[in-house]
């Protein structure tokens, strides 16, 4: 029994060291920005009907999606933050850029300000971003 204890401790130590090494590698991976992308935040009345239907089906829970226009002219990126208990929320698009293999988007949900009169009704904040069509995958941050 005593001979097995050092072997078990050694195995546990090896697994821990491997875990630490693997996690360090993925964190050090830098994404090289190729260029910032021009985009438009689309108001509800200008969102394609099919996309609006998808948003309405998903809006209860947080969601992220990309949608291509039927003519492949535009790419729509949508980020929804799910049901919120009050009104007064907004969403900022903090970054949207192209890398060598993906489009990265960073958004932020902004709560109601302390000075703002808050409506006590459930809301479903989301943002729809439109840009010229690109094939790259979208990475949501």
Segments (PLM) and residue ranges:
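Exposed, flexible binding/inhibitory loops of compact, secreted disulfide-stabilized domains
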Residues: 4-9, 19-141
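Classic N-terminal secretory signal peptides
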Residues: 15-16
């Amino acid at each position: 029994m005593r001979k097995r204890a050092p072997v078990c401790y050694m195995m546990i130590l090896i697994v821990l060291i491997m875990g630490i090494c693997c996690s360090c590698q993925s964190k050090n991976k830098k994404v090289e920005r190729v260029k910032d992308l021009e985009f438009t935040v689309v108001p509800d009345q200008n969102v394609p009907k099919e996309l609006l239907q998808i948003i309405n089906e998903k809006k209860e829970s947080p969601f992220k999606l990309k949608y291509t226009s039927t003519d492949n002219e535009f790419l729509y990126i949508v980020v929804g933050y799910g049901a919120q208990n009050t009104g007064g929320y907004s969403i900022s698009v903090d970054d949207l850029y192209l890398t060598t293999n993906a489009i990265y988007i960073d958004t932020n949900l902004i709560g109601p300000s302390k000075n703002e009169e808050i409506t006590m009704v459930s809301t479903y904040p989301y943002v729809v971003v439109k840009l010229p069509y690109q094939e790259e995958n979208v990475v949501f941050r």
